Design a protein with these regions (language model features):
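Membrane-interfacial terminal anchoring regions of lipid-handling membrane enzymes
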Residues: 1-878
Length: 878
């Protein structure tokens, strides 16, 4: 007999509930969902993925992004379109990179790469759920996606698909983005969305597709066959994954214009922001839709704005409309580029060959370039490089093409539009402008409209802030024309954001050395021609060292105007000019700051700044060491060779100068080597010196201010007056940091001088310093960087001493000054032939005219300037 249970204690019967069992299984990812990938791939999957994904490249951006995210962040990768290929690639590749790999694909169904046993369990679990609930499980309503993401799994989400809108809008299914917004609202952990796009090439999308694009899909959105063929090609460099800045949902929902919206409207705004991000991301790599040149010209000429311009021109000029239209069309035909990927590839081949055979390679600031890539995802870039060589036209296009960025449209002088270079430059994105728009209102307005059109289309624009090439080796004063037009276009809202990028393009040696020396000596500039191109082939047999490209931080115009609390659309003429001037000089200073100090510049500076005909090599080494030490202390960027082995790099350059005849070696005994400077070669050495002179100008000003003190003991306050005078005196030659005062620069240089034992602080008196015995010689070596310019300005001042007011026409002044300089040099009144520089004369003339000199009648002012110049020269050389 069975014992009966005691009364009051009910019997617990075990019963099987199919509904409960299936619900329990649905909460376990391994049993239920096709949206979840295994933690690791199986051996067969690894073989397949390695074969198909081997040509897909990923840069360091993902790791850098992940390093910035909080440790407790919930992370989802987002793509513009639904793509199982991208989901599988991200899961497979990111695991191997040590990055969070997406395992949860919201609205994805991945069955084929699931383990067999798991696939069976998924089938039975989903079947049981269907039998018990009469519908398939919804991972949104069951909380499956939410729970997995909260547990630390990384998600994968897409913005759009062919059926996505129908699913959300017509069938009222849960929106994945609405789901993660709800998730952010219930957790303190930040949710981050990382936008990523898989690119199958960098060719710009054309508004007229080719037959191949129609059949197999475009490079932007390739069909399955095109994707497959692209992936399996050997050594294919075209396929890569690109990432944009992550979106923090917590910050997004806290934005004032988002905070008060309903979840539905917040989702809509999030989708719009992501769509804009993906659009700018693609545009930052492939560029905007590429139109035919004739189509672009027609669209400009038929625009309402140009129609109004033409009507005004008819009214003001009295010409008939057809004649004015023809003139406008001719202007645009003269200006417009003919951008072609074919010519970009030719540029690539040509510069690759030159860098390998003529130069010793190119050194690129990769960190700076990465910042530029991110800025390009917010709007068009305004690239503002310095200009030292015709090669500059190719360098940035070459770099951008190699780094998967759209090549810029480049502003070039009309003098370069000659055949055959004109069509070649146009094909690479060059558009041409005249040197002056004076007295041609129609041309000016057509040109500005063309620039506005390029920016509104989304093209990057490159122009040289100095206008023409610098023949002196240092930066020239900025020209405001194109920058002013860019600011006007920005004020008209042609783009939501523009970023100005100061860029330094430097060379150990430039190809145009000889022509620059000819022009600096007063020779006429020869117009560009095919004959010059043929003669230039002789240069191809010479090695020209390295090319250096460095980027400063982009200047966001949105941030710039926000900081100044100005509306760019409401600037008056004076404010516009002030803003333009400020930005121009900021660009010039930024370019100087990111330029590279080369061994050529340091050796040339040491040779020219020593005041002796024969220089012991040991003494030359001391001077070079002093200059190099200063550069290190001021954190100046160095050429690669100076970073690896500076002594060897400087010695190699000195030997190269001997081989080229710039200097002679007075003895073959290495222990007693003496250098004799070839006086006729001083101008070319001055060009190299000027490549680095901007780094030494604060030291030169500070040194000369110290030398001007009667005693070898002084306070920092004693130096400010002289420092300020020198800054004003050479305002057209050298450009001071707009964000640093003279007092700050003096303090910084005093610290560097103390570290180099040039100065010692007074033991008891505060802010008081003494010059050491060895320091006095070094102060003269630093201040010697100013000697050439002091002598040039002395020549200009002698012009004012000799000629009364209005006796020499303004256009003839420079010729008179150059002739006077030659005579003074022959009489021994000028000791440095490099001071006979037309550019220096021009800047000196501008300074004296600005200070009020008009002619020999201004005796008191002339005498004051003369005494000061001679005083400075004597302090340095005696």
């Amino acid at each position: 007999m069975h014992e009966m249970p005691e009364p009051g204690f009910p019997v617990k019967r075990r019963s099987f509930s199919l509904r409960k069992w299936s619900r329990d299984q649905m909460t376990h990812e391994k049993e239920s969902s096709t949206s979840v990938l295994n933690r690791k791939a199986g051996w067969l999957s690894i073989l397949i993925f390695r074969f198909f994904f081997r040509n897909i490249h990923t840069g360091p951006e993902l790791k850098e992004t992940m390093d910035r995210l909080p440790e407790d962040a919930i992370v989802l990768y987002a793509t513009p379109r639904r793509s199982t290929l991208e989901f599988l690639f991200s899961w497979f590749r990111y695991q191997r990179m040590g990055m969070p790999a997406p395992r949860i694909g919201l609205d994805y169904k991945v069955i084929i790469f699931q383990p067999i046993l798991r696939s069976i369990r998924i089938f039975f679990t989903r079947a049981l759920y269907l039998l018990t609930h009469f519908r398939l499980a919804d991972p949104y309503t069951t909380g499956f996606y939410r729970n997995r993401l909260m547990e630390g799994h990384t998600g994968f989400i897409y913005l759009s698909s062919k059926r996505g809108f129908e699913r959300r809008f017509l069938k009222s299914r849960t929106d994945a983005f609405s789901h993660i917004i709800d998730l952010q609202k219930i957790t303190e952990r930040p949710v981050y969305i990382i936008p990523q796009t898989l690119f199958f090439g960098i060719t710009p999308h054309r508004d007229t597709p080719s037959i191949i694009d129609l059949i197999f899909g475009s490079a932007e959105d390739p069909g399955k066959i095109r994707r497959l063929l692209t992936l399996v090609r050997r050594n294919n460099q075209k396929v890569f994954m690109d990432f944009s800045e992550p979106i923090c949902l917590k910050d997004f929902l806290a934005e004032p214009e988002i905070k008060g919206l309903s979840t539905e409207n917040q989702t809509l705004q999030l989708r719009r922001r992501l769509q804009k991000t993906f659009t700018l991301q693609r545009q930052s790599i492939t560029g905007p839709v590429l139109k035919q040149r004739t189509e672009l010209i027609e669209s400009i000429l038929t625009s309402e704005k140009v129609q109004r311009i033409l009507e005004e021109e008819v009214r003001d000029s009295g010409k008939n409309l057809p004649a004015v239209r023809k003139k406008a069309n001719d202007y645009l035909d003269e200006i417009a580029a003919n951008y072609s990927m074919g010519w970009i590839k030719v540029y690539d081949i040509a510069l690759t060959w030159m860098l390998k055979n003529i130069f010793e390679g190119i050194s690129v600031d990769q960190k700076g370039l990465a910042k530029i890539r991110q800025a390009a995802k917010k709007g068009p870039l305004i690239l503002v490089p310095c200009h030292k060589s015709h090669l500059d036209y190719l360098v940035l296009s070459y770099l951008f093409h190699h780094n998967k960025m759209p090549c810029p449209h480049i502003a070039a002088g009309k003098n370069l539009s000659f055949w055959p270079l004109g069509p070649i430059f146009r094909g690479g994105g060059a558009f041409f402008l005249r040197r002056t728009f004076k007295d041609n209102r129609l041309y000016a307005r057509i040109f500005s409209t063309y620039v506005e059109t390029l920016l509104s289309e989304g093209f990057n624009i490159e122009f040289f802030i100095e206008g023409g090439r610098s023949r002196t080796g240092k930066l020239l004063s900025p020209k405001m024309g194109l920058l002013s037009q860019t600011l006007s276009a920005y004020g008209k809202g042609v783009a939501p954001e523009l970023s100005i990028v100061p860029i330094s393009i430097g060379y150990d040696r430039v190809l145009e050395e000889k022509s620059y020396l000819h022009e600096l000596g007063g020779g006429e500039k020869k117009p560009e021609s095919m004959g010059q191109l043929v003669k230039a082939r002789k240069s191809l047999k010479v090695r020209y060292g390295k090319v250096y490209v460095n980027f400063d931080n982009p200047i966001s115009l949105n941030d710039y105007f926000a900081e100044k609390n100005l509306n760019p659309a409401e600037l008056d003429k004076i404010t516009h000019q002030e803003i333009c001037t400020d930005l121009a000089y900021r660009c010039i200073h930024s370019i100087n700051q990111v330029s590279v100090a080369t061994p050529y510049g340091i050796v040339a500076g040491a040779l020219l700044n020593l005041f002796q005909p024969t220089i012991p090599y040991a003494r030359l080494e001391e001077v070079m060491e002093a200059y190099l030490s200063y550069l290190y202390r001021m954190d100046i960027r160095m050429a690669d060779t100076l970073q690896v082995n500076p002594d060897y790099a400087l010695r190699q350059v000195a030997e190269a100068f001997v081989q080229r005849g710039f200097v002679d070696a007075a003895t073959e005994n290495r222990d007693d080597l003496r250098i004799v400077l070839n006086e006729s070669k001083r101008p070319i050495l001055d060009y190299y010196k000027n490549n680095v002179i901007a780094f030494f100008i604060p030291a030169a000003y500070t040194s000369l201010a110290i030398l001007e003190q009667d005693a070898l003991q002084f306070t920092s306050g004693d130096l400010h007056l002289t420092y300020g005078r020198l800054t004003e005196f050479f305002n057209d030659e050298f450009f001071q940091d707009p964000d640093r005062s003279a007092e700050l620069l003096v303090r910084k240089n005093l610290k560097a001088f103390i570290d180099d034992a040039i100065l010692v602080p007074h033991p008891t008196l505060p802010d008081t310093y003494n010059v050491t015995a060895s320091g006095l010689r070094k102060l003269k070596l630093f201040s010697a960087f100013l000697l050439t310019y002091l002598e040039s300005y002395w020549v200009v001042l002698n012009f004012f001493m000799r000629y009364p007011k209005d006796t020499v026409a303004p256009k003839n002044r420079l010729k008179k000054i150059q002739a006077m300089g030659q005579r003074m040099s022959k009489r021994g009144e000028i000791n440095r032939i490099e001071a006979l520089s037309g550019v220096n004369y021009k800047n000196g003339l501008a300074f004296f005219l600005r200070s009020g000199l008009e002619g020999s009648e201004d005796k008191e002012a002339i005498e004051a300037h003369a005494n000061r110049i001679q005083h400075y020269i004597n302090l340095i050389v005696t």
